[in-house]
């Protein structure tokens, strides 16, 4: 049976907010082997009956089932389109797929026209962090066929129609480089409207826009007034259309949110509630006043079609306990990012007061020091007697625990639930194996992603930072792509990388660059506010990684000028191809740093030049993929950088001038080691590892590639040994200490229960979770092929080791489910492989001496392994090592 199991539209299911003709793709399943699509038919219609075609491809002879963009068909704004597809393999034909849909926002040629209205009209409002309401009324005079809303805000907003919150999105409009890039959200609102009087409204709060944020703790980073803008498109049954905008007739007043900030939490006083504020046509009671219109450059407003922040999971409190100091504490059993929903019964003046935190101290008491200045609290004051359920709307915290400072009535664990929040992305990868510690490690870096991919890839979710550090996002990118469908998330963020680049092409340390123009007085930024190696290289490495994982050249086309700008910045500021520029983080927080320093021992000119070469080499590949004539020029540049690196950082005997683990790792993994010295470099790396009793002492630059540098050079055992270390410093040390996420420091929590430091000690910092990439690519054996990216041709090449009895790895690509499970029994390996329809695979049996069961595949003997090509289907192979 041949059928289409799902349809992708711009990498999503039924996306809303499409601004241009999207990409289409589909997954085909079959119970046969070697199935390749020969033709497809794609239809787009304005109705689900498919009688009002916008596009009908007819039967197209093509094997393409991903990244397809129709060359004809014009989309209208604020319109719902229905999609279906069928395909055949030259013999069997699928039925029509289930009908999918997408909804457009403003399409090409239309510009944003709704003004921003603000209730913050007084000068004093500029310096406070309160919440406000804005509202307006309109009349629907006849039956509605369909209606859509496009909304955005300066600050954070929730949108209401006739008293109901519209959509599941939270923390809208998200965090972008607001002056250059602001997103609007699109909603289908037909069912929210009624004939007669209607009320539209929004709750607003400062958020990232005007709250206290960043390393410099500045207020009003993007503006000093919150605001809301709305455009409704209503189509009536009689064929007419009406447009309704925010305007000067709207009213505003303060809301019960008397304080709200990202770092510090939210305070809600129910005594200031205004009943019917978003549902009564007549002005309800309250201090309503005329709004002000906030000037804003509407040219930077763009549609958001995916990766919106939502409440994804709910975790009930596991227990309530009392610390040795007498503190009452909730334990949710998992470190996470989000908020707490609480149900309580009280009387006027009673207060619910919770303070969120990550870990207990060595005595088992509340530990808040690593939050630094972040208060991370939530407060609710009762206005009347009764039972309420409440949660903060415009903030989030990083926590496993919450201290109950005040709560009326009987306090029971069942009255508290943690609502985890992150950008909505489908989970695509999973690994389970015979070692439960490795299973927990996988859990930990997955939850590191869940906790920090909250609209931007932040470093941490708990302290007074939570910034889009480019280095963290770069080193974790490929791991993230295995774990979840991050294409839309990264595409949105990479646009901010581009718009925040300097005129020379330099890349800020954090994106969005909230620190722009605020370097004075900050010990770090005053040394250089942008363009650190490994951090800024995200401009090239992330688009390339997305291309490898999803097979889409569009991201390379979109980001090409950004990538080129970064390469040219490095070229301009290098001296004879050695690159080093102002503030460099180097091998950040490496354990070979001098006492009291965060900067590792590997010299900056080495790490900088290594990344200069690596990014330039990737850019050469990108230019060739896009068939750019200038590819040859950059190939020449790359050759010069590599030559200079080898002349500078290797001596005449082939020794590296820097005797650190990281120096050898990047030289090997980035392909910078002279061929004549490769074996010697590998040997020296293993010696440096042995010198530390088999432990790493690497930081942000060396850690992500350590196991790769070993396993790619014949040291698979050493790579597994490194991964499986259980004492400090190691990945599994954290697991053994009870971690449920990845820590910022290898010894954030020491064996005696004491802390690494108070000022920089996050327990939810995904960067070192980059080991996940090695676990998927090497331990799990699931590797993308550069010549057929996006897993159109997958290379199954697991390295057996680590005394593991089995490893079961799945990855859901744009073509379907890939699976590889290997199991070892007394020297005999059984490998189960699943290859999706319309893809092919290369299966490599590492160290195979004899294949006992080929399951119909033709294996050839290679140097150190056996290899066969396979079409789609399931295979079970047995071989002896």
Describe the predicted segments one by one.
Residues 1-80, 84-463, 471-472, 488-489, ...:
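Extracellular/oxidizing-compartment recognition motifs
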Residues 147-151, 161, 339-358, 394, ...:
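Alpha-helical support elements that line or immediately flank enzyme active sites
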Residues 156, 229, 247-249, 253, ...:
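Active-site acid/base region of carbohydrate-active enzymes
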Residues 157, 166-168, 173, 497, ...:
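Active/binding-pocket-proximal capping segment
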Residues 200, 204, 269, 464-465, ...:
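C-terminal capping/lid segments that line or modulate ligand- or cofactor-binding pockets
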Residues 220, 224-231, 242-278, 282, ...:
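Non-catalytic C-terminal accessory modules of carbohydrate-active enzymes
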Residues 543, 613-616, 620:
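Non-transmembrane amphipathic alpha-helical segments
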């Amino acid at each position: 049976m041949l059928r289409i199991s799902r349809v992708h539209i711009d990498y999503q299911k039924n996306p809303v907010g499409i601004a241009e003709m999207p990409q289409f793709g589909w997954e085909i399943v079959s119970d046969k082997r070697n199935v390749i699509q020969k033709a497809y038919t794609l239809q787009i219609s304005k109705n689900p009956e498919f009688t009002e075609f916008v596009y009908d491809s007819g039967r197209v002879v093509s094997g393409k089932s991903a990244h397809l963009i129709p060359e004809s068909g014009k989309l209208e704004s604020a319109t719902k389109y229905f999609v279906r597809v069928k395909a055949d393999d030259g013999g069997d034909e699928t039925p029509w797929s289930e009908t999918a849909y997408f909804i457009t926002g403003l399409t090409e040629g239309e510009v944003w026209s709704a003004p921003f209205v603000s209730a913050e009209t007084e000068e004093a409002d500029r310096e406070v962090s309160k919440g406000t309401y804005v509202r307006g009324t309109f009349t629907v005079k006849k039956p509605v066929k369909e209606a859509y809303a496009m909304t955005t805000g300066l600050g954070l907003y929730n949108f209401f129609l006739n008293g109901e919150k519209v959509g599941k999105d939270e923390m809208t409009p998200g965090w972008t480089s607001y002056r250059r890039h602001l997103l609007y959200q699109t909603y289908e609102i037909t069912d929210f409207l009624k004939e007669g009087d209607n009320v539209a409204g929004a709750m607003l709060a400062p958020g990232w826009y005007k709250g206290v944020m960043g390393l410099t703790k500045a207020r009003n980073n993007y503006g000093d007034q919150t605001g809301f803008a709305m455009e409704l498109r209503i189509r009536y049954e009689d064929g007419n259309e009406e447009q309704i905008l925010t305007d000067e007739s709207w009213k505003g007043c303060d809301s019960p949110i008397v304080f709200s900030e990202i770092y510090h939490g939210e305070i809600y006083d129910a005594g200031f509630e205004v009943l019917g504020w978003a549902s009564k046509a007549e002005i309800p009671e309250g201090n309503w006043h005329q709004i002000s219109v906030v000037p804003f450059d509407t040219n930077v407003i763009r549609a958001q079609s995916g990766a919106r922040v939502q409440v994804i999971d709910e975790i009930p409190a596991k227990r309530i306990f009392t610390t040795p100091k007498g503190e009452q504490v909730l334990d949710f059993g998992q470190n996470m990012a989000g908020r707490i929903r609480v149900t309580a019964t009280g009387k006027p003046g009673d207060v619910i007061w919770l303070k969120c935190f990550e870990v207990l101290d060595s005595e088992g008491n509340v530990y808040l020091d690593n939050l630094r200045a972040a208060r991370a609290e939530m407060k609710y004051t009762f206005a009347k007697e009764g039972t309420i359920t409440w949660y903060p709307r415009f903030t989030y915290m990083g926590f496993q625990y919450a201290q109950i400072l005040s709560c009326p009535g009987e306090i029971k664990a069942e009255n508290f639930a943690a609502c985890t929040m992150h950008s909505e992305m489908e989970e695509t990868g999973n690994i389970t194996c015979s070692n439960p510690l490795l299973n927990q490690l996988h859990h930990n870096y997955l939850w590191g992603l869940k906790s920090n991919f909250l609209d931007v890839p932040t470093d941490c979710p708990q302290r007074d930072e939570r910034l889009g550090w480019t280095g963290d996002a770069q080193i974790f990118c490929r791991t993230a792509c295995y774990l979840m469908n991050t294409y839309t998330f990264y595409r949105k963020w990479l646009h901010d990388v581009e718009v925040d680049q300097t005129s020379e092409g330099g890349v800020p340390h954090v994106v969005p660059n909230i620190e722009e123009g605020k370097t004075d007085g900050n010990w770090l930024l005053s040394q250089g506010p942008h363009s650190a190696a490994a951090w800024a290289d995200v401009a090239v490495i992330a688009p390339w990684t997305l291309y490898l994982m999803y097979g889409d050249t569009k991201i390379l086309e979109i980001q090409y000028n950004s990538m080129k700008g970064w390469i040219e910045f490095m070229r301009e500021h290098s001296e004879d191809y050695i690159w080093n520029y102002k503030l460099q983080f180097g091998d950040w927080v490496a354990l070979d740093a001098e006492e009291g320093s965060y900067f590792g021992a590997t010299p900056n000119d080495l790490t900088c030049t290594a990344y200069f070469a690596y990014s330039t080499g990737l850019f050469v590949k990108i230019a060739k993929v896009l068939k750019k004539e200038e590819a040859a020029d950059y190939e020449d540049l790359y050759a010069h950088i590599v030559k200079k690196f080898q002349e500078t950082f290797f001596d005449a005997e082939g020794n590296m001038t820097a005797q650190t683990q990281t120096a050898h790792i990047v030289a090997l993994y980035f392909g910078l080691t002279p061929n004549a010295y490769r074996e010697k470099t590998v040997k020296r790396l293993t010696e440096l590892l042995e010198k530390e009793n088999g432990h790493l002492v690497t930081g942000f630059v060396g850690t992500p590639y350590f196991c790769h540098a070993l396993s790619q050079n014949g040291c698979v055992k050493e790579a597994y040994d490194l991964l499986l270390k259980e004492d400090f410093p190691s990945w599994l040390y954290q697991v053994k200490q009870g971690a449920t996420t990845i820590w910022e420091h290898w010894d954030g929590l020491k064996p005696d229960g004491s802390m690494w430091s108070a000022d920089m000690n996050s327990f939810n910092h995904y960067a070192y979770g980059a080991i996940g990439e090695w676990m998927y690519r090497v331990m799990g054996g699931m590797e993308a092929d550069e010549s057929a990216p996006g897993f159109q041709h997958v290379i199954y090449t697991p390295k057996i080791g680590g005394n593991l009895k089995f490893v079961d790895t799945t990855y859901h690509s744009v073509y379907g489910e890939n699976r590889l499970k290997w199991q070892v029994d007394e020297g005999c390996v059984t490998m189960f492989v699943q290859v999706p329809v319309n893809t092919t695979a290369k299966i490599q049996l590492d160290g195979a001496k004899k294949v006992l069961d080929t399951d119909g595949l033709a294996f050839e003997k290679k140097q150190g392994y056996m290899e066969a090509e396979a079409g789609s289907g399931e295979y079970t192979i047995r071989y002896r090592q």
